[in-house]
Swiss-Prot record:
Pfam families: HHH_5, RuvA_N
Gene designation: ruvA
Lipoprotein is among the record's keywords: no
Positions of the UniProt region annotated as Domain I: 1-67
Protein name per the record: Holliday junction branch migration complex subunit RuvA
Domain notes per entry: Has three domains with a flexible linker between the domains II and III and assumes an 'L' shape. Domain III is highly mobile and contacts RuvB.
UniProt source species: Prochlorococcus marinus (strain SARG / CCMP1375 / SS120)
Region spans: Flexible linker: 147-155
One BP term from GO: DNA recombination
Main location: cytoplasm
Sequence segments annotated as region (Domain II): 68-146
Length: 222
């Protein structure tokens, strides 16, 4: 099973509602379907690292790729639910960043889940029933009871995911670290540690940190 690819972007392709990238790895070209927001980040990138799930079908196999391991692993959890296929799982991830989707499932936010095209009330309820207690390991989170409801505490180092994503997009580690430091100074949302890594405070998700980091990198280069 293919689970990870490192290679050069040849072209971006589109087939109906599905979009993706052709990536060349050791002389072999792989067509990989991606989330729309992932494609938007790949416009200026040549060398890619993708976390991949391989779907086996009667007419062949299909590769679905993600820019970080969290999204790939969450995708695998989603398709383990009865009635949730690969394309519906992609639709859920298109509508909600991984951290928000995990929160919606663990907190039983049926309305948020059904706002995704193709997800009815029964499917949303199955997602909650089957996954509610199976997602905390994905982001190193812990669940605790607070006022009779579940509250999700993030203990993951989101900065590591953002750093990995930006390195995959050909940004230099030095400019990423500089952007992190600037964001730390301006918001105090990132705490510098002895190993010169960063721990994101609770409440700051992947999408927010990625956006803020890119703003600072692009401002510096512009």
């Amino acid at each position: 099973m293919i689970s990870w690819l490192n290679g050069l972007k040849i072209e971006i392709w589109e087939n109906g509602t599905r979009k993706g990238v052709l990536i060349s790895c050791s002389g072999v070209g792989y067509e990989v379907q991606l989330l729309s927001r992932s494609l938007q980040l790949l416009n200026t990138s040549k060398e890619l690292i993708l976390w991949v799930h391989e779907v086996h079908r009667e007419d062949g196999s299909q590769l679905i790729g993600f820019l970080n391991k969290l999204e790939r692993d969450l995708f695998r959890k989603l398709i383990s639910v009865s009635g949730v296929g690969p394309q519906l799982a992609i639709s859920l991830l298109e509508k909600n960043p991984a951290e928000q989707l995990i929160s919606a499932i663990t907190k039983k936010k049926i309305a948020q889940l059904t706002s995704c095209p193709g997800v009815g009330k029964k499917t949303a309820e199955r997602l909650v029933i089957e996954l509610q207690n199976k997602l905390s390991d994905l982001i190193g989170s812990s669940l605790k009871k607070t006022n009779n409801h579940l509250e999700l505490e993030y203990e993951t180092n989101v900065a590591d995911e953002v750093r990995s994503t930006l390195l995959n997009l050909d940004y230099k580690n030095s400019e990423i670290e500089k952007a992190f430091l600037e964001f730390e100074t301006s918001s105090k949302s990132i705490r510098s540690k002895a190993q010169e890594s960063f721990e994101v405070s609770k409440g700051l998700d992947f999408e927010t940190l990625l956006k803020e980091t890119l703003i600072r990198i692009n401002t510096e280069s512009g």
